[in-house]
Amino acid sequence: MSIADESLSAMQAILSGMTSEQANRAPALPGANSPYAIGAHCVGMADYWGGSLIAGLRIPRDRDSEFRAQGDPQQLCVELGRIRRLIPGHAAIALTEGVRDRTTVGTTRNATDREASATWMLLHIVRELSQHLGQLEITRDILASADR
């Protein structure tokens, strides 16, 4: 899970260097998300797949609100750090016990994904974090370019 940790660490580095105004502004592009919303979605996604499904923790999730989320980027960095600390434990559960709770809801993916293997779920977390790190990097660069 070192790739997940690297992605989360890089997200923290980007967001910690932003003011609230910078973190909460989306590029002027259709459907674009703010850096804060991207990070909030990553927290929600990891809490859902790792915490709720794999670990059985039943963490409430409102996926749609993740993309409208606004707040202090420093506090979001704390949440990303929490996810960094939890992922190794979720991976251990996945590899030793499998998935503890397949009934939880909180994703737009189809219901059959909740029947996927624990390994698939871990790989999904890694893929999503890597994908959204790239999105965050591009978003940061677009916003910086617009400020010049």
Task: Identify the role of each PLM range.
Residues M1-L15, S20-E66, T104-R148:
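Short, contiguous alpha-helical
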Residues R68-G106, S117-I125, S130:
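Acidic/histidine-rich alpha-helical segments that form the ligand environment
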